[in-house]
Amino acid sequence: MNALPKTLLLGLCIALAACQSTQPDTLAKSARLNISEPLLAGLEYAQLLNGDAPWAGADRVQVDDQGLLLLDAAGNSLARHAGRFEGLDHRVDDKGLLLATVERKRQQAMLIGLNAARAWSQPLYLPRTAFAIEGLCLYRDSARNDFLFLLGEEGVGEQWLVGSQGRLLGEARRVRGLSLPPQSAFCQTDDRAGQLYVNEENVGFWRYPADAEAPLQREPVDLRQPFGSLAHAAAGMTMVPGGLLALDSEASVLHLYRQNEAGWQADEVIALDGFDEPERISARRSAEGVELLLADERGLQSARLDWQPPALSQPEPIVSLPAAVETGPVPSLGDAADDPAIWVHPRDPAQSRVLGTDKKGGLVVYDLDGRQVQDLRVGRLNNVDVRNGFRLGSKRVDLAVASNRDHNSLHLFAIDRASGVLSDVGEVATPLSEIYGLCMFQDRQGTTYAIANDKDGTFLQYRLDGRSGQPRGELVRRFKLGSQPE
């Protein structure tokens, strides 16, 4: 049997991934598009407000030769920030508005807020990028952190943390660089689902996880024919609950997708007669269907689409707690910081310590302000735990135990109850071949135990005793799970 060429195999794999349902072969007739007059000539960037705005009558945000504008439905200005800008995205709630754009003269991304009293915040400028910014989009996670994605045409991108809890940061923080498809100029995010959508002009539309710590893995939403339903060029896209609307600019058509449990289902294709390569779109769900703003080479056109995709019920997002303190990096490079434990000072909680394993080199100790106070270079420690009131010779100390992957041992540290200083008091050997996780337990009689596991699922429980002045461990229980525990 002859093997398929690699290029054909790749094409088949992508096509199978993209074909989540039957693709429409002809232009659909059921969803009616009603174009409104007049055309707003020369305008490229405008978005319908999606959310509960605090200003009566507020309808959309817009970029024109006057700057950034907040407008009502009749086009009257409710607020204006002067300047020359390109690109636009927004988030709005009952507290106010957050806008993202690019300041043309500086060639820098800019964020600015508008509060309920229509007062503008100080602009927040991102550092100038090494690439020309082709597209941008905001993302607000479940903890109300605001991020900005920047796209460059050569397949480069960046993600920046720009705000938190409805406030812009004093200084934006670059979270990560992104390797994106070439010819990417449009993006959108789904805040609730934590997804980033990006176009690749000559290929199709892709979906990525938007979370900053998620792997940058993509899935196709739709691809060019014959692997998908797109005829020519993937351009701008927008979202409404239960629906994705995406433009094929060269074909002058609008693709509609319904959300189902498996992903996105190609629903209908709407001809955009009279449009000249429409590239940008904004949408807002209404009782009658979907309100649209469409921008092409001539300008901006409003429309109404008689289409109401059912919105899927979404699970409640996992609650995230913002960090109050951050330490500096651990001494080892790369993915090294691993497992923390907190030792509480018995008399002065402000003098408590945070113990963190550097899984490439040892145990690092921090105060509650995140400052490093000790660095114990004892080997590759993976997990650490703490218990109080351990008898070590004639004195009572608190005890930290860590799993040492260099020696497959339990590594013990005495904690001085007055100063919080840790000292290395030895190791307890184990027969494990790849020690991994560890936790501690103290029974009602005050006996202290350490429970360690191997990558093969084996667990060993040791009774710890330090009355002789030298800690010892007695194996008291052994059991095994069917897969690797953490």
Q: For each predicted feature, which ranges?
A:
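Bacterial N-terminal signal peptides that target proteins for export
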Residues: 1-8
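Hydrophobic helical h-region of N-terminal Sec-dependent signal peptides
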Residues: 8-14
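C-terminal motif of bacterial Sec signal peptides marking the signal peptidase cleavage site
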Residues: 16-18
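Sequence/structural signature of beta-propeller domains
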Residues: 20-486
